[in-house]
Amino acid sequence: MTNTRKIHPLIKIINHSFIDLPAPSNISTWWNFGSLLGLCLAIQIFTGLFLAMHYTSDTMTAFSSVAHICRDVNYGWLIRYMHANGASMFFICLFLHVGRGMYYGSYTYSETWNIGVILLFAVMATAFMGYVLPWGQMSFWGATVITNLLSATPYIGTTLVEWIWGGFSVDKATLTRFFAFHFVLPFIIAALVMVHLLFLHETGSNNPSGLISDSDKIPFHPYFTIKDILGAVLLILILMILVLFSPDLLGDPDNYTPANPLNTPFHIKPEWYFLFAYAILRSIPNKLGGVLALIFSILILMLFPLLHLSKQRSMMFRPLSQCVFWILVADLITLTWIGGQSTEYPYNIIGQLASILYFAIILLILPTISLIENKLLKW
């Protein structure tokens, strides 16, 4: 008799995705981040749901409702800090997941890759709106500065900003709509994740060698389920250490001051995971140019399938490309550091150089190095 999991209309979908899925036998720990991102999304949705039960999206009470959650709600402090630090874990996993895709050439599955880039945009939008909700100083001024960037749009800019604000400044209408969007976007992200997996399972997973692995596949369960569980345990361990020992390590002290439109913080900056893009934005003196550079810094990922000129898929056997890749990683870390500094000498110069290097590596240096490697291999 055929096993129920193989014939039941609903269960067989799960079976083909997580149980009997043929997976390459040599995928490393770098392939764990997909499942960890799923876990992060689940944690964020559940903690967010419980926070939404106690939060009020009104400028008069938003800040005190967050304080109320931390002080008066049973384990409210735990839920709030799991949600805040869960976002940081989410982005750490996202950056590592994207980095793995770049290193091992997973972007050659262009549909999966492009859906992934759209997911990255959606998660960044969700995180930005979530940062506004506690209605502290950095929430208010971050929202003002970032939404104001849209005014750089030719002709319709000012109208567009006022339309998003729901008035002539960031106020009650802005907070209410940001809360609404912040609540609904994770469910849209979950739907996009399904599409991401659908396209992935059409082609099967890539592997570190970048070679076709059809002749050497093993079932996902139990081999990779146990591997994913280990990753999940480590992720939760790191998250809980962060939450229980230093929950405000990655936050901004300014956000413990209620929003005040009459008092600008000394240094307005977003959360740490946006600092690299913020540094690119600030490195261009022109407003519209900065906004375009900011958008293109993420959108450029969609060009990876087109810019792949190497005869080999993975960087595993391409030492020159590996060097350039790690320079790119160092450059992104530099941009993150610069984004957190004030705009003065020498930080502004370093930021401009790092921004130029970022685009140069992706658009020029990596494709050129790939062609050189092809020549060295007499291909």
Curated annotation (Swiss-Prot):
One of its GO terms (biological process) is mitochondrial electron transport, ubiquinol to cytochrome c. Its cofactor is heme b. InterPro entries: Cyt_b/b6_C (IPR005798), Cyt_b/b6_C_sf (IPR036150), Cyt_b/b6_N (IPR005797), Cytb/b6-like_sf (IPR027387), Cytochrome_b (IPR030689), Cytochrome_b_C_euk/bac (IPR048260), Cytochrome_b_N_euk/bac (IPR048259), Di-haem_cyt_TM (IPR016174). The chain crosses the membrane at residues 33-53, 77-98, 113-133, 178-198, 226-246, 288-308, 320-340, 347-367. Heme b b562 binds at H83, H182. Keywords: Electron transport, Heme, Iron, Membrane, Metal-binding, Mitochondrion, Mitochondrion inner membrane, Respiratory chain, Transmembrane, Transmembrane helix, Transport, Ubiquinone. A ubiquinone binds at H201. It is found in: Mitochondrion inner membrane. One of its GO terms (cellular component) is mitochondrial inner membrane. Component of the ubiquinol-cytochrome c reductase complex (complex III or cytochrome b-c1 complex) that is part of the mitochondrial respiratory chain. The b-c1 complex mediates electron transfer from ubiquinol to cytochrome c. Contributes to the generation of a proton gradient across the mitochondrial membrane that is then used for ATP synthesis. Heme 1 (or BL or b562) is low-potential and absorbs at about 562 nm, and heme 2 (or BH or b566) is high-potential and absorbs at about 566 nm. This is Cytochrome b. It comes from Marmota broweri. The lineage of its organism: Eukaryota, Metazoa, Chordata, Craniata, Vertebrata.
